[in-house]
């Protein structure tokens, strides 16, 4: 039996990457700073005390972070029996965004520059928004700026509901985001608008259009829903997911994975939102998975709910919940299965601003004949994709070095 379970802890970086200076992120450390705030009693909203991640620690998380930063995170140390192989990965890709991290992890680094909307106000070219509005049968829109997704709802959500004008906004990432009320504007209308925007953005080389539906009656109860959709461009070449699919294997997407890969290389898509539902869905898909299958889950809440919102307590509580459920998942593993835990970038909740941070990401690997211990510093996220290709006996990827035992 050959099955790979990939758990993507979206935004869970473990220390500033070697090139963090190019991004203004020197000193960032998502894991380390969360652990520090917990140890100092500054992350006690809904939880309390030091950050407790015993199962991730046994897989090698704290040791991987020590190798990345030079020191154990506060509250973590050598007093643990390591059962997994662990390392830290440097990103080759030009950006610190979600598609770049995911694609590189699957063997296809993004070596070109994405397009960006760098102006914080009046962010979008008029000729672009005019075309989108005309095709959608609309006349005006709101936003046109860099913004936090929750803040912009507080500021413009009511006006959107009164006028029917969609909210267009962006960030430091290569994204064009559209927020609309599910009921007053309509979910299908939002999706159609995003499809139009995706087509019109082709010349601008923007990585993703994101549909951001929300509900509620006013700023006090506006809330984004689980009906988000990402409209990504296709990866520039075949990922390891494509290769397994072409070889007759199965690739199960749980959560937003399928959207991130523009549905390429995916054989089954399972919708789930929220940490609990995503974990439940992952367990169910592992139970159903046969030979030559990848079950791939993105746990987006770490990023969207806690990283971008700079919510240290929330991030810590979510990590502890995730950690507490890992034994359930590991109990489902069969002999020969490969479990991989990693991240796509950082999003340090103690950092200035609301954007991602350029960090090393962990690679925690368990099973499939791997010996417990250090995998060292990995030169690319693509080492993960190359290792998956090696595990399944697929043709080698162009990028990355496998850390799997010799066949």
Swiss-Prot record:
Cross-referenced InterPro entries, in alphabetical order? Answer: Alkaline_phosphatase_core_sf, DeoB, Metalloenzyme, Phosphopentomutase_DeoB_cap_sf
Q: Which GO terms describe its cellular component?
A: cytosol
Single Gene Ontology BP annotation: 5-phosphoribose 1-diphosphate biosynthetic process
Pathway per its UniProt entry is:
Carbohydrate degradation; 2-deoxy-D-ribose 1-phosphate degradation; D-glyceraldehyde 3-phosphate and acetaldehyde from 2-deoxy-alpha-D-ribose 1-phosphate: step 1/2
Which source organism? Shewanella amazonensis (strain ATCC BAA-1098 / SB2B)
Recite the UniProt cofactor note for this protein. Answer: Binds 2 manganese ions.
Q: What class of enzyme is it?
A: isomerase
- Per the UniProt record, one Pfam family is Metalloenzyme
Q: Which residues form a coiled coil?
A: none
**UniProt catalytic activity:** 2-deoxy-alpha-D-ribose 1-phosphate = 2-deoxy-D-ribose 5-phosphate; alpha-D-ribose 1-phosphate = D-ribose 5-phosphate
Q: Which residues bind Mn(2+) 2?
A: 303, 308, 356
- Please explain the role this protein plays, according to its UniProt record: Isomerase that catalyzes the conversion of deoxy-ribose 1-phosphate (dRib-1-P) and ribose 1-phosphate (Rib-1-P) to deoxy-ribose 5-phosphate (dRib-5-P) and ribose 5-phosphate (Rib-5-P), respectively.
Is Zinc among the key words of this record?
A: no
**Localisation per UniProt entry:** Cytoplasm
What's this protein's name? Phosphopentomutase
């Amino acid at each position: 039996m050959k099955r790979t379970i990939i758990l993507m802890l979206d935004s869970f970086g473990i220390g500033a990457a070697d090139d963090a200076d190019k991004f203004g992120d020197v000193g960032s450390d998502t894991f380390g700073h969360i652990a520090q705030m917990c140890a100092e009693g500054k992350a006690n909203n809904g939880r309390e005390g030091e950050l407790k991640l015993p199962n991730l620690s046994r897989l090698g998380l704290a040791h991987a972070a020590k190798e990345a930063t030079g020191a154990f995170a506060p509250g973590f140390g050598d007093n643990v029996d390591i059962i997994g192989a662990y390392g830290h990965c440097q990103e080759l890709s030009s950006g610190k965004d979600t598609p770049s991290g995911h694609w590189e992890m699957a063997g296809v680094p993004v070596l070109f520059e994405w397009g960006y909307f760098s102006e914080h106000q009046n962010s979008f070219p008029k000729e672009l928004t005019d075309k989108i509005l005309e095709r959608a049968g609309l006349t005006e829109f709101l936003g046109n700026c860099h913004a936090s997704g929750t803040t912009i709802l507080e500021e413009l959500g009511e006006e959107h509901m009164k006028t029917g004008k969609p909210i267009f906004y962006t960030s430091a990432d290569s994204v064009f985001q559209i927020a609309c009320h599910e009921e007053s504007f309509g979910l299908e209308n939002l999706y159609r608008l995003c499809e139009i925007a995706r087509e019109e953005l082709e010349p601008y080389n923007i990585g993703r259009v994101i549909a951001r539906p929300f509900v509620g009656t006013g700023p006090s109860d506006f809330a984004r829903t689980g009906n988000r959709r990402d409209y990504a461009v296709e990866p520039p070449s075949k990922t390891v997911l494509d290769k397994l699919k072409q070889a007759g294997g199965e690739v199960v997407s749980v959560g937003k994975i399928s959207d991130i890969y523009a549905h390429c290389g995916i054989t089954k898509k399972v919708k789930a939102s929220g940490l609990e539902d995503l974990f439940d869905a992952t367990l169910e898909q592992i139970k159903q998975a046969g030979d030559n299958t990848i079950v791939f889950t993105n746990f987006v809440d770490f990023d969207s709910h806690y990283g971008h919102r700079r919510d240290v307590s929330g991030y810590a509580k979510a990590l502890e919940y995730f950690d507490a459920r890992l034994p359930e998942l590991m109990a489902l593993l069969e002999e020969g299965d490969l479990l991989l835990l990693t991240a796509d970038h950082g999003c340090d909740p103690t950092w200035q601003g609301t954007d991602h941070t350029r960090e090393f990401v962990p690679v925690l690997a368990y099973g499939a004949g791997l010996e417990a211990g250090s995998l060292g510093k990995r030169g690319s996220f693509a080492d993960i994709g190359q290792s998956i290709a090696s595990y399944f006996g697929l043709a080698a990827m162009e990028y990355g070095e496998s850390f799997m035992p010799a066949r």
